[in-house]
Amino acid sequence: MQYSNYHSHCDFCDGRSFPEDFVKFAIRNGFRAYGFSSHSPLPFETFWNMSKEDMNEYLAEIRRLKEKYADKLEIYCGLEIDFLDKTYNASIPYFQELPLDYRISSIHYLPLQMPLEEENMMCIDGSYDAFKISTEEYYGGDIRKVVRHFYQSSCEMVEAGGFDVVGHLDKIYMNGQRFPGFSLDAEWYKKEFFNCLDLIQEKGLMVEVNTKNYVKKRELFPHQAFLKCLKERNIPVMVNSDCHYPDLVNDGREAAFDFLKDAGYKNTCELVKGVWREVALE
């Protein structure tokens, strides 16, 4: 089995270590390929996104590591790019003109009103307390409205394009499942989720199986209960750890492989000499 990871955060954003530390871990643990995907710049400052001012240094550092470890590991430079709306996403010229090997697109924020500033956003990837307050204040306490907004934004992200991989597709359930009235089994929830899957299938995009929460909570994104639904649509997948610490690079990977096999997958997608290819799940 060939190990690879393409969703990774270092000290250029909210990661907790230098890029080279992740590379060294990957080499020690037999990885064939490793990709960096720092949180992209946003129109506003956050503690977890990198700034545009740091972009050239980020690109240069990953390029340096590519050259230094060329005989030991395939290293790739990507970004995890936030979809905010049709005016700020992976498809805009700024992100398209960057010399990246790949792009992941994810949703962390739901815009509540203009302009695109942090105080006008609902963060779906923060604390439950903040999530609950925003749900009550802006959605009348109706979790269905939040889920609908999330998947509408997800579909707009897929339509906008400009990226290779859908990041943590159903992250809304992380906090949503703690809210009264939410259930992954509910027909209203599955309708929103499946509509998004159908569009991903139509556009031919890859979806990551994100293992970040697996060790602590035994949960994947997309949730393992839905991996068969991806397979039924022949949606290509890869396994990423979304790690922020080097020693967490491999967390949950073997479990994700097992879930994928159970769902009927025979292959995952990997970059091989710069080209996306299917690699056997052995």
Residue ranges of each PLM-predicted region?
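Conserved, mostly hydrophobic/aromatic
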Residues: 7, 26, 103, 168, ...
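Extended substrate/RNA-proximal surfaces in nucleic-acid metabolism proteins
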Residues: 55-202
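An N-terminally biased module of ancient metal coordination in phosphate/nucleic-acid-related enzymes
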Residues: 1-85, 89-97, 173-187, 234, ...
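Extended, intrinsically disordered, low-complexity segments
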Residues: 264-282
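Hydrophobic residues within beta-strands of alpha/beta enzymes
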Residues: 34-36, 103, 166, 207, ...
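Extended hydrophobic/aromatic segments used for targeting, binding, or gating
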Residues: 191-195, 209-243, 251-258
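Conserved beta-strand termini and adjacent loop/short-helix elements that scaffold enzyme active sites
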Residues: 78, 210-212, 270-273
